């Protein structure tokens, strides 16, 4: 007997239009009517998932940040797996040496050591990777500026103060223009 359906978001739950199809919504409702729980499982931060949950009136739990956080239906963290702050400093020392957009996913949202302009460039690179349906640089810029992830980004001006705060860090994300440099960074972090 099936007790739970857990679905990834991108390319599974949501389609290339970044919406949930009527067919998927009906399947979720049908499963729930049979007593089967539905959950979203994603590498995204919960703050990126919540608008979708609200828009489609989903009543579900969520595993976010590649398993780093588990949320109940009300959006409360039930379980979190976080990175030791000493390890965070080591990771940042390596990541901040290159030409990378560095994002830090925490229990209090996402942060970056980059400037707003650098973050926008990183969001545009990310959009070009994941949203091939856009047709021009102006569409990529418009998409990046309207993205809730960009709008809600927190900017770190003092890394020491940030690390002294009560923030809990679950994940790092980085994007670079050179695949070779990204591979080199990965090797340094291993």
Please annotate each region the language model reported.
Residues 3-18, 91:
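Asp-based phosphoryl-transfer active-site loop
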Residues 6, 62-63, 173:
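Residues embedded in well-ordered beta-strands within globular domains across many folds
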Residues 16, 40-41, 174:
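Small/polar loops that bind or transfer phosphate-bearing groups
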Residues 22-137:
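Active-site phosphate-binding/coordination module
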Residues 98-100, 108-190:
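Conserved acidic, metal-coordinating active-site core of Asp-based
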């Amino acid at each position: 007997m099936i007790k739970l359906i857990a679905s990834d978001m991108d390319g599974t739950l949501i389609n290339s239009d970044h919406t949930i199809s009527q067919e998927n919504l009906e399947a979720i409702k049908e499963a729930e009517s049979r007593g089967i729980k539905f959950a979203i499982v994603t590498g995204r931060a919960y703050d990126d998932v919540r608008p979708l949950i609200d828009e489609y009136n989903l009543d579900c739990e969520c595993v976010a940040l590649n398993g780093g956080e588990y949320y109940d239906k009300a959006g409360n963290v039930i379980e979190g797996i976080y990175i030791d702050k000493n390890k965070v400093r080591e990771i940042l020392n390596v990541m901040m040496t290159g030409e990378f957009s560095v994002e830090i996913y925490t229990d209090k949202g996402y942060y970056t050591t980059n400037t707003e302009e650098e973050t926008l460039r990183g969001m545009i690179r990310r959009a070009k990777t994941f949203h091939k349906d856009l047709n021009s640089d102006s569409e990529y810029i418009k998409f990046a500026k309207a993205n809730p992830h960009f709008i809600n980004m927190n900017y770190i001006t003092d890394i020491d103060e940030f690390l002294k705060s009560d923030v809990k860090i679950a994940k790092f994300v980085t994007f670079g223009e050179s695949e070779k440099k990204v591979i080199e960074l990965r090797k340094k972090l291993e």
